[in-house]
Amino acid sequence: LNLAFNRQERTAESIIISGKERQINIENAPALSIDVEQNIPVLSKADNKKWGVIFGIENYRNVSSVPFARRDAEFMKEYFNKVLGIPTENIYFQTDESATLSEFKTVFDPGGWLAKNAGKPGNEIYIYYSGHGAPDPAGNKAYLLPADGNPNYAAISGYGLDQLYANLAQLKVKQITLFLDSCFSGANRDNETILASARPVFITTTIPSVASNIAVFSAATGNQISSGYSDKQHGLFSYYLMKGLRGEADSNKDNKLTQKELNDYLSEQVNTQARRMGREQEPQLQSAEPERVILQW
């Protein structure tokens, strides 16, 4: 053996392994992607004969919030413009604290913004509302609840559906289509009562009839609640409304979407998902002409 005196020999344990230093890149995880918010298709050209009104109220002064209602409204504005072909300047848009009872009256009352601007023969009007609905227990009437409204005094601080439908019926226009992501049971999207009485059984209201040129898509039936869809960050009804409008509700693939097709799609999808969440929610359509085409592309 060639071992020198006082010389330290290398052993297996003392062998140093060298290598190049490598930089590890850690990329940020992508943000949550909501399909209905991505690549919204342009299905209609801008048409000056089309008008829109959008109210989305998430935060209220006197009652619990409506999760995702403002987000619903913001993206429905894009759908109104790109999918339905409503020019941006023809859309009346208010959210949260700006959507007061005064604003509802300004838009919907006789002689208001809608009547002065859109109330002409040949025009089409689209209305979207996401927020609380409230019942009047005394008269079983249904009200849309503005941001400054109080559900315990819906008759004086809300905007009645019967009043809304009557005012719209006076407009001599071609067609009016409403999308109401609200319920009138006295409960919020978390199935909690919004009334001071805290009744264990929610209230069934009487929904007024509509004129022959008015179609109303409602999120729920009777005393059901209009649910939120946390995974998609939208109201359950609004989420599937957007999916349906972008073409998924076109059941026969003829590039035309009728009221009936949209309602059938909403009924199936919303009801199925609501049951997965342990709830019942059945959208409904009020229309004298369900085969009427909403859009074609």
Predicted regions span which residues?
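Glycine- and acidic-residue-enriched helix-capping/strand-helix junction motifs
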Residues: 60-74, 78, 154, 228-232
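Caspase-like cysteine protease fold
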Residues: 3-4, 9-21, 32-34, 38-45, ...
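Short glycine-rich His-centered loop
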Residues: 48-64
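Functional beta-strand-loop-alpha-helix junction segments that form "active/interaction loops"
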Residues: 11, 16-39, 73, 77-123, ...
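Caspase-like (clan CD) cysteine peptidase catalytic core
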Residues: 49, 102-130, 134-193, 263
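Short, conserved active-site loop motifs that form the nucleotide-linked donor/cofactor pocket
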Residues: 50, 91, 214
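Active-site-proximal C-terminal subdomain of hydrolase catalytic domains
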Residues: 56, 80, 95, 173-280
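Stable alpha-helical elements in mature extracytoplasmic
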Residues: 69-76, 100-107, 160, 164, ...
